Amino acid sequence: MAAISINVSTVKPLGDRVFVKVSPAEEKTAGGILLPDNAKEKPQIGEVVQVGPGKRNDDGTYSPVEVKVGDKVLYSKYAGTDIKLGGDDYVLLTEKDILASVA
């Protein structure tokens, strides 16, 4: 079986799903103490890189997703599916898992 090469630009979320590049975890505390990998909090903020067409309504039309590519979003801690591509961390979320858009 041939290996599949996946690029971020080829990921097309379905329905009301949103593909988010996770912001890096904090490397040290406010006091300057370096954190080991096992003590770092899982980030809950990231940048939207791909958006699905939206939730399908009963009449066949779509309700578009409220966020757009480039938006920074805050999402639930244990939400979505974690994906690693090209050394970067991503998460595939449903729109309901997004808590807020961050300016």
Swiss-Prot record:
Primary place of residence? cytoplasm
Do you know which Gene3D superfamilies this protein is assigned to?
A: GroES chaperonin
Q: Which UniProt keywords apply?
A: Chaperone, Cytoplasm, Stress response
One matching Pfam family: Cpn10
Name the NCBIfam families on file.
PRK00364.1-6, PRK00364.2-2, PRK00364.2-4, PRK00364.2-5
Q: Which family does it belong to?
A: Belongs to the GroES chaperonin family.
- Share what the entry says about its subunit structure, partners included: Heptamer of 7 subunits arranged in a ring. Interacts with the chaperonin GroEL.
Q: What is this protein called?
A: Co-chaperonin GroES
* Name of the gene: groES
